[in-house]
């Protein structure tokens, strides 16, 4: 059995180009996603890439709503070849972003605060309910 091809860090554009059949990079990007899905390749997906994808894909007409974007991103994160740090927290943040109407950065900070027990320091009290907020009164 041969070892999977190590792709390194996976950039946002791979996941965007793979959505558009008329894009010149579509075939290669789809092939890379297929290799990640079947485990013949591995790559790291950083939280910054997830953030950028939530931003870009929400502004394009490819997906009807945030929940559809979340399903696409969760599908990629579930691929055997996709590696990421702190997957449970990343998935929690993605779920909050999709269902609560908050920005991904706020969803990520809240999920991290809940996972680590650390407080949030923010003027924005609305999006950080449930965790201590150390912003001075």
Regions found by a protein language model. Give the residues of each.
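Acidic, PIN/NYN-like endoribonuclease modules and their adjacent C-terminal/linker elements
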Residues: 1-7, 110-137
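Short, well-structured N-terminal submotif of metal-dependent ribonuclease cores
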Residues: 1-45, 61-68, 126
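Short beta-strand scaffold positions
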Residues: 10, 44-45, 84, 104, ...
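Alpha-helix capping/helix-boundary segments
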Residues: 14, 49, 89, 108-109, ...
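Acidic catalytic patch
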Residues: 21, 47-49, 71-98
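Short active-site oxyanion
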Residues: 38-43, 80-81, 115-119
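Active-site-proximal, substrate-binding regions of enzyme catalytic domains
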Residues: 54, 58-80
């Amino acid at each position: 059995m041969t070892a999977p091809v190590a792709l390194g860090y996976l950039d946002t554009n791979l996941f965007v180009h793979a959505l558009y059949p008329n894009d010149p990079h579509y075939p290669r990007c789809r092939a890379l996603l297929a290799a990640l899905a079947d485990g013949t390749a591995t790559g790291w997906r950083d939280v910054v890439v997830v953030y950028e994808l939530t931003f870009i894909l929400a502004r394009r007409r490819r997906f009807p709503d945030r929940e559809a974007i979340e399903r696409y991103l969760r599908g990629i994160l579930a691929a055997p070849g996709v590696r990421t740090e702190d997957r449970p927290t990343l998935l929690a943040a993605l779920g909050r972003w999709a269902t609560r109407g908050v920005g991904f950065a706020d969803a990520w900070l809240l999920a991290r605060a809940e996972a680590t027990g650390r407080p949030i320091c923010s003027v924005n009290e609305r999006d950080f309910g449930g965790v201590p907020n150390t912003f001075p009164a």
